[in-house]
Amino acid sequence: MGRIRKLLIPGVDKKLLVRDATRLMPDPTRRRFIAGGASLGALTLLTGCDVSDSFSAEEMLKQVSKFNDGVQAFIFNPNALAPTFPESAITKPFPFNGYYAVEDAPDIDGKDWKLEVRGLVDNKKSWTLEELYKLPQVKQVTRHICVEGWSAIGSWTGTPLRDFLKLVGADTRAKYCWFQCADPDGYNSPLDMASALHSQTQMTFKFGDEILPRAYGYPMKIRVPTKLGFKNPKYVISMEVTNDYKGGYWEDQGYNSFSGS
């Protein structure tokens, strides 16, 4: 998945703008929406943008993405559960997914690792893995859905994020939980608070009955079965409760921030 390049279209040729927007847009659903006949007038109505000579396809994509985020957030039902499956349905082998090879995944020493918790919380501190392992944990067998079009079913065990947020005295009126990861390029991702408080959103420490493998995000990933895979950050090293939208690795490249599955 490559980075979106800037594209300015002099004179705003309508067919060219829609063609380039279709090619640049990463989400297949939105790509089909534009390719299926969305006119510039419709896009202007939806995004609130006035298409002018200086308007770029990239800017149009940002506005459509912002609109989509708002719609998805509005219709999100915090009480609706992602489907669960029997353990017999687990995908074997469960695929590794990343923008780098598995041998280049972060190799973290769990004895030295700590989860830094900061932002709008009463209890700002760094949690050791041993401390986190002592928290109550639950298992879920849910489907991981990748933005690239494939899916796989896995078994994940960990602490519900909403329970941890309550434990640290997080201000759950805040807009986001923002996660920083140990990936080579400094992967990070925001999670809207409604999704963070969903009962299935989990701080994951195990895959199956084993400690979370390196390939799947050791020592901790955030499992969000109601969202696409890139919204499930791995190798998490810090969590911040905030009202500020700080962007994210893929979000900054044009992917929807909400990205419900």
Where on the chain are the PLM-derived regions?
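N-terminal export signals
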Residues: 26, 32-52
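Feature targets compositionally biased, intrinsically disordered low-complexity regions
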Residues: 1, 10, 35-36, 47, ...
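Short, cationic motifs built from Arg/Lys/His that form the positively charged side of catalytic pockets
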Residues: 30-31, 221
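Short, aromatic- and cysteine-enriched interfacial helices/patches
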Residues: 4, 8, 46, 51-55
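N-terminal secretory signal peptides
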Residues: 1-28, 39-42
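Structured, non-membrane catalytic/scaffold regions adjacent to prosthetic-group chemistry
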Residues: 17, 51-261
